[in-house]
Amino acid sequence: FAVTSGSLPGGLSMSSAGAITGTPNGVDSDTTSTFVVTATANSATATRSFSITITAQPSGGTISTATIGGTAYTFHKFDAPAGGTFSLPGSKTIDVVMVAGGGGGGESWGDNDTGKGGGGAGGVLVRTGYSVTAGQYSIGVGAGGDSKQVSTGHSDHRGGQGGNSTGFSVVAVGGGGGGGSDNYGSGPGPGGSGGGGGARNGNN
């Protein structure tokens, strides 16, 4: 067996026994290679035309694969704070799991380091069977909120709001910051959306 006209896709080769082996090179768009194979045996010769199509694959993020319930999946994971770009060479149906940043915990004000509220969890959005067309998609990943981002006197040492995560025209909202505690008589700080409120410490 030998390829006598045309060529195999890049990265593939044919042995004299007719076996095609190798890993095809990545392509930016679906690519079809047409070639002619000639087989010779006992002074007889036969030819036949074949074609192989290499399908372009999406790119972006940290890529991994897994088989779940007998179905093979490819995962593209984007991390905070950089996010990234998801490149799709052709229309596909995908599943999207988007997690926003959690809110930061509140901070104590005063001598007693207790009573601060925990930050709220970041929002989670799940979209299955989501149809998207070819293109470049910007993915934003919300970071966790900072501690004591908002401060207005003793009573409000609240944690910062978690960042939103965005992509494919949907938004997962970041968690609210936890309320700060108070040890000086001004009262505990309230928590943001999903964040725990602060507590009053001491007798001042």
Residue ranges and their predicted role:
Residues 6-25, 36:
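Strand-loop-strand motifs at the edges of beta-sheets in extracellular beta-sandwich domains
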Residues 23-29, 130:
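Short, surface-exposed loop/turn segments at beta-strand-coil junctions that are enriched for proline
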Residues 29-42:
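A short beta-strand micro-motif common to beta-rich folds, especially ectodomain repeats
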Residues 39-45, 146-147:
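Short, solvent-exposed loop/turn segments at the edges of extracellular beta-sandwich modules
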Residues 44-55:
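C-terminal edge beta-strand
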Residues 70-72, 77-85, 99-169, 180-187, ...:
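Glycine-rich strand-loop-strand elements at beta-sheet edges
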Residues 89-94:
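Extended extracellular/luminal ectodomain segments enriched in beta-structured repeat modules
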